[in-house]
Amino acid sequence: METNRQKKIGSVIQKDLVDILQGEVRKNGVSNLVISVSKVSVTSDLSVATVYLSIFPQEKAKETLEGIKSNTTLIKHDLSQRVRLQLRRVPNLVFFIDDSLDYIEKIDNALAGKENPIENRDLLDKRRKS
């Protein structure tokens, strides 16, 4: 269970990370790429922030995530410059791809199909935790 402080820090980080990532996409002249930060969860000791990204189009998601992971220190520095008046110490950032939209789409497609996935549980993949 997240405390109010964790939620507030997560929302501050989320808002500023969106600006940083979208600014880098625009600055590098990459077209047809949308990066959104769907969720940021902060550990109880405020040392690690887990960032879930939705990247569209899905085909560029893995390579974009690798680029973001390789530039984590620069992103953290930019973030610390933006939130220096709100946070004493910026948590370490860990990035993951948010696959919840894909999972929801698979469920919708399975429910619209001929066989019922509620009766036959083998139709849907097990969701993996990241």
UniProtKB/Swiss-Prot annotation:
Keywords, alphabetical: Cytoplasm, Ribosome biogenesis
Highest taxon above the source species: Bacteria
Pfam family membership, one: RBFA
UniProt-annotated location(s): Cytoplasm
A single MF term (Gene Ontology): ribosomal small subunit binding
Signal peptide: none
InterPro entries with a match to the protein in the record: KH_dom-like_a/b, RbfA, RbfA_dom_sf
Biological process, per Gene Ontology: maturation of SSU-rRNA
Its biological purpose: One of several proteins that assist in the late maturation steps of the functional core of the 30S ribosomal subunit. Associates with free 30S ribosomal subunits (but not with 30S subunits that are part of 70S ribosomes or polysomes). Required for efficient processing of 16S rRNA. May interact with the 5'-terminal helix region of 16S rRNA.
Family statement drawn from the similarity comment of this UniProt entry: Belongs to the RbfA family.
Description of how the protein assembles with itself and partners: Monomer. Binds 30S ribosomal subunits, but not 50S ribosomal subunits or 70S ribosomes.
Protein name in UniProt: Ribosome-binding factor A
